[in-house]
Amino acid sequence: MPSAVLEKPLNEINKSISTTANVHFINDPTLSEQFDTIQLSFELFIRVFPDTGSDDSNNMSENKFVLIKLLGAPDYFKEFKIYRVTSIDHSAPTSNSVIFINHSNLLKFDNQLTLNSCVIQSIDYSCIPTIESLFVSVPPNIYSTLHDKPSTSIREQFINTFLLNSGSVVGTGDIIRSINGEVKLSEPVSQGIVSNNTNIVLIKTVENNNDDIDYNEKEIEDQEVSEDDLDSEIHLDLSTYLSSSLQIDSPAVHSVKLKVEPLPAKMSVDMLPPIWLKEDTELFVFANTAELPKLGFPVFNGDSVKLNYNNDKMIVKLFTFIEPNKSFRRRTLYLSPILLANLKLSSNSEVTLEPIRQRDHPFTNFFPVAKSVTISRVSSHITMDKTYQQHFFSELKTTFHKNLKCVKRGDFVPVVIDTVLAKTMFDTNNLIQQQQQLQPGEEENAPDMGVIPTGDPDEVAWFKIVDISGESHENETNQFIIDPTKTRLISSGVEFIKLPPNDFTHWYQYLKLPPVFNFNKAIDSNPTCFKYVSEFKKIVTTSLNSRSKINLKTTILLNSMTRGLGKTTMVRSVSTELGLNLIELDCFDLINPGAELKTIGLLTGKIDKLIGAQENSTDTDSSYHVIYLKHIENLCAQSNQNEQGANITTSLSLKVIQTLNEYLNDYSNLMIIMSCNDLDKLNENLRSLIKFQIDFSVPDEKERLEVFKFLIENETHKLINSNNPEPFEDREEFEDQFDVSTVSFSRRHDISFSSLALQSAGLTPRDLMSIIKKAKRLAISRLMGLAKDSNISLEKLIKVGNGGLITWIPEDFNKAINDARNQFSDSIGAPRIPDVKWEDIGGLDLVKDEIMDTIDMPLKHPELFSNGLKKRSGILFYGPPGTGKTLLAKAIATNFSLNFFSVKGPELLNMYIGESEANVRRVFQKARDAKPCVIFFDELDSVAPKRGNQGDSGGVMDRIVSQLLAELDGMSGGAEGGGDGVFVVGATNRPDLLDEALLRPGRFDKMLYLGISDTDEKQSKILEALTRKFKLADNVDLYEIAKRCSFTFTGADFYALCSDSMLNAMTRTANEVDAKIKKLNEELTSQGKEEISTRWWFDNAATPEDIDVLVQMEDFKKAQSELAPSVSAEELEHYLRVRENFEGGKEKAMANGTTSAANGTSQGIPHEFMQKVEELIGDGIDGIVDENGNHIHASSDH
C-alpha cells in the first residue's frame, strides 16, 4: 500500500463500498492486447473507492480489487468473484458502468450474454485470503512443458506471468489464458491470492473427455430441439415478416405451437416503466430470447400478446429470460403456476401467441374494471379454521391492494399465511378482549388488528372468483381488473371443490412454502426408489377416479418399525400433488383417559368442522377428503384381557371403528389413512377395518441418495444476498453485526452424493436431516478457525474468500456422519463400521483371496445376479480358538465399507414363547435396513446346534435354528428376498456340533478353515501386523522372534506376546525414570535443596526420549519366556481331523462308496441292516450318512 494512503484519517481507510451498476461485455478478437480486462467508469470508480485521490485514479499505480456478482443468471453466477480493476474508462456508456473486455471466464458464452446489471463492491488487498493449494488442469503439451520444472519455478511463473493480469488472484473455475488451463480446485477457500507458499498441482487434461462446460451442453441440447422446426425457419419469408409490422391486425406469418411449463419461482423484471409497477405479475409469461423471431410477428421484450389455449384466449405480457441460463428449455412458454391452474393446462397442452394492437400499453387499456367481485373460500383445513380467518382475510386484502389483479370468473386466488403467527395473534387478541371486557361504546379502545405481519408462510388458503359484474362489451377475453378503490369485494360462503393439483403446476414451490420432498422427481430419476409411494399413489388415484361409480370405502394403514421414515411426508406430498383436502389428526391429541365419549366427540368434532357442511357428492370436481390419523396404535391399542382396564381400551377401539365406518358409509368422497409404528400394539378389531397395508422400511442406498440430493439442494438453492443495493446507492459494507445464519451454502464439486448415501447406511430421513445440520455447523466452525488463523473477520472471509457462500467440503460430511453414528447408535440401533484393516491381519492371505471372490463380486457387479443367479453370501470360519475369526469378520466390514452386526447366542434367547425367534427376525430386519451389512454370528455352535439333541422343554433352540434357516434362505434370494447386500458370517470352534442344514449350498456354503501358522514367515507377518503401531528399537528382529516360537502359537497367543512386550517396555521405561528421579533427588539433598516430585519432573525436566516407550528385543524375549501356548498339539490334531472330515471326508467317502458298490458290498454295513432301513422307510435308499457326515452308498443290487 502506498504511504499516501496510510497518512489518511483512520476512519477513512479501507472502506468497502457496494452498489449496483450497469454491466457491458465486449468480446472482440481484434482487441488482442486487451484481455481479461475490467474497466470502471470514472464516476463509479470514485464512488466505490472514495479513499483514492484523483492522481491515484488517473495513473492506477496501485492494484485495486473489487467483488462483482452478475445479476439475473443464477445458474452460472451466484457468488461474488474477485477482479482486479485494470483501468478507468472515461468514455464509458454510462456513469455507472462495469466493462468486461475479452474476459477468459466469459468467452464460453460468446455474445449470448443479456445480463445488464451487477453488484460491485470494493475490497482491500488485506481482506483477500491466501490459497494454500491450487489444482489446475492444463492440456498435455503444457503439462509436458511444466512437468519437469521445479515447483519454485512454476510458482514464480504463475505469480509473475500467468496471473499477472489478475494481480495473482485466482479462484475455482477460472480460466488461465496463458496456459489454456482451468482452476479445478483451490483450498482452503474458493478464491484468493497465489503466494510463494502456495502448493500448485498440475493435472493433465484427458483428450476427448466428457467434462464439458454446462453451457455448451445446453447449446447442443437446444440445437437438437430446434431442428424440429428448422423447416419453418427456412421457409420464413423475410419481406412478409417485416411487412407485418405495418399491419398489426394481420395474422401471424406462421403459428408456432409452444409447450407450457410452470415458472419455478416468481421472476423479477428489471427497469419496468413506472406505469407498469402495479401490473398483475401472474400474467407475465416468459420464453427464451431465441423464441421471439420464430413467433412470426414482431414482438419485443415486455409486449402484450394474445395467448390462445384450449379454444379460449387471454392477454398476457411476454418477457424473455436473461441469458445465459440452463434451467429453461427452448420452444416452451413459462407461465405462473397459478395461471396454469386457472387455465387448466397440463404437460401435454400447447399454446400459440398472436399480436395485438397497443402492445406496449398496460393492462388497464385492455380490460375493464370490475364493479363487484364475489369471492368464496375453497374448503380446506385452513379456510375452515376460525383461528386463521382474520389472518388470511387480511392477506387477501393485501393481495388485492398490492397489484391490480386481472381475473376471470372461476379463477383461483391463493393466499399464504403463517399458521403459528395466526394462532398466536388469535389467542392474544382473545386474551386482550377478555381482560378489557369491552363495554358498548368502547370499541375504539380495542386493539387494531388491521395490519398483520406476514411471518414465515407455511400454509395456503385458496379462494375462488365466483362472480364478476362489469361492462363486458369489447372484452373478448372476459378478463377484469380488480381496483380496490372502485371494485366492491363480496365474500360469499364456502366452495366444496377440488383444490388445484400440484403435480404439474408446482404451485407449492412457487409460493415458497416449506419444502417437501418431491417423490415424483426421485422416482423419475430412479424408478426402483420408493416403491411404497407408487403403491400408495395407485390406491389413492383408483379411489379418486372410481368414486362416481362405487364407494370403495378406502382405508390404508401405513406401518413401520422405525420412526421418522416419512409416512406423514408421503401423505402430505401426495395430497398436495393430487389436490386432496388433507385432515391431519394426531391421536395423542385425541386421547382423554377414562373419558371415551369425550375422545369420540373430539374426533368427530375435528372432522365435522371441515366436512360437516358438505353434502355427499360423486362429482369429480368436488372436494375429496383424506382423514389421516397418526399414531393410531395409541388410540386403538391392543389389550390383554388379563390386564386392568382392558375392557375400557377395547370399548374405545370399538367406538372409534364405529365412528370411522359411519364416515365411510356417509361420504363416498373420503378415505381414511392411519399410521402406526408397532403393528403388534394395534387393536385386532381395527385391523379388520383396514383394506390396504403399506409397510415402510429404512431407506436403501438409492433412496438415501435422493434424500441427500433434496436436502443439499434445498440449502444451496436458497436466495442469497437478495438485499442488493439500489443503483447509485453507496452502501458501506462490513460495518453492521454479521449474522451467519443468513448466508447460503454451496457444495464443492468433489462431494459425491453416492458416497454420502453409502456411508449413511441404516439411517432414517430424520437422521439425514440432522447430518445436514451438523455439516452446516462444522463448516461454520471450520471457517471461524480459518478466519482466526488468517486474521480476517468471518464476514470478510466468507464474502471475499468464498464469494458470499459457505462451501461444504467432504470432511464436513464425513465428520457429521461419523458423529451421527456415534451419537445415535444406542438410540436408533445404527450399526457402526469397525476400524480393522487388512494390515491388522497377518498370515491369512489365502483366506483373504477367498473372501474377496465371495463378497467383492456381488457388491461391484450386482448386474450379474439380476437374472436369477443365486449369490453366495454365507461364509463360515472354523478352526482353533484365537486364530482371528472375529477379527477377519470385522476386516470384511471395514474393507468393503459394510455395516457390522455382531450377534451372540444368549442375546437371542428370551423366556417368552416366540420371542427368541422374533429376535432372530429383528436381527435380520435391522441388517436389511442397514445394508450393505455383515451379520456376524460368533460361536455359531451355541446359536444353531443340531436339532433334536437339546433337552430344553420348549424346544427353543430347535425353533431358533429353524428360524435362522428360513432367514438365511431369504438372504440368498437376492433383491426379491430383501437380502441383496447382506452377508452372513459365522465363526465356530466346533463345526461338528452345527446343524447339518446350515451347511447346505445357499446358506453357510463357503467354509474357510483358519488354522495356526505353520511357517516362520507366516508367524512373522502376524507379528508385523500386531506391532504396526509400536515403536520398535533397531535391535528388534521379528523373524528371529518368530523362529523362537513353536508352531502351536495362535493369533491370540501372538497378541498376548506383543501386549506383554509392550508392558515390559513400559515397566522398564518407568523404572528408568524412577532411577533418574532418585538420582536427581540425591543430588538435591546433598546440596540441601528440597526433593522434586515425579509430576514436576515430567512437566519441567523430562525429554521426549524419557517419555517415548521403545520396545527392545529383551522385552520380547522376556514375554516369550513367560508365555505358554493356549492350544496343545493334541488339540491341534483334533481340529485337523475335523477339517479333514468337512473338507476331504465327503469326497473320500463318495469315492470309497463308488468302489464298494462296484465290488457288490455295502462298505461294511450288514445286508440285514440295509433291508431293515428300507422296510421302515417304505422305499429304496441309495445309502446312509454316518455320524461324521460322510455319505456311504449302498450296493448296486439294492
Curated annotation (Swiss-Prot):
Class of this enzyme: hydrolase
Please write the reaction equations for the catalytic activity of this protein. Answer: ATP + H2O = ADP + phosphate + H(+)
Q: Which GO terms describe its cellular component?
A: ATPase complex; cytosol; peroxisomal membrane; transporter complex
Q: Record-annotated residues binding ATP?
A: G879, P880, P881, G882, T883, G884, K885, T886
**What's in the keyword line of the UniProt record?**
ATP-binding, Cytoplasm, Hydrolase, Membrane, Nucleotide-binding, Peroxisome, Peroxisome biogenesis
Keyword Nucleotide-binding recorded: yes
Q: Could you state one GO biological process linked to this protein? A: protein unfolding
Q: Where in the cell is it found?
A: Cytoplasm, Cytosol; Peroxisome membrane
A Pfam family cross-referenced in the UniProt record is: PEX6_4th
CDD domains listed in its UniProt record: RecA-like_PEX6_r2
Answer whether the UniProt record assigns the keyword Ribonucleoprotein to this protein.
Answer: no
How does this chain sit within the bilayer? Peripheral membrane protein
Which residue ranges run through the membrane? none
Task: Give the Enzyme Commission number.
Answer: 3.6.4.-
Any one GO MF term held by the record is: ATP hydrolysis activity
Q: InterPro entries of this UniProt entry? A: AAA+_ATPase (IPR003593), AAA_ATPase_domain (IPR050168), ATPase_AAA_core (IPR003959), ATPase_AAA_CS (IPR003960), P-loop_NTPase (IPR027417), PEX6_4th_dom (IPR056995), RecA-like_PEX6_r2 (IPR047533)
Family statement drawn from the similarity comment of this UniProt entry? Belongs to the AAA ATPase family.
Q: Give the record's subunit note.
A: Interacts with PEX1; forming the PEX1-PEX6 AAA ATPase complex, which is composed of a heterohexamer formed by a trimer of PEX1-PEX6 dimers.
Q: Which PANTHER family match?
A: AAA-FAMILY ATPASE, PEROXISOMAL ATPASE PEX6
Q: What does this protein do?
A: Component of the PEX1-PEX6 AAA ATPase complex, a protein dislocase complex that mediates the ATP-dependent extraction of the PEX5 receptor from peroxisomal membranes, an essential step for PEX5 recycling. Specifically recognizes PEX5 monoubiquitinated at 'Cys-6', and pulls it out of the peroxisome lumen through the PEX2-PEX10-PEX12 retrotranslocation channel. Extraction by the PEX1-PEX6 AAA ATPase complex is accompanied by unfolding of the TPR repeats and release of bound cargo from PEX5.
Question: Can you name this protein?
Answer: Peroxisomal ATPase PEX6
The opening ranks of the lineage are:
Eukaryota, Fungi, Dikarya, Ascomycota, Saccharomycotina
Q: Which gene encodes it?
A: PEX6
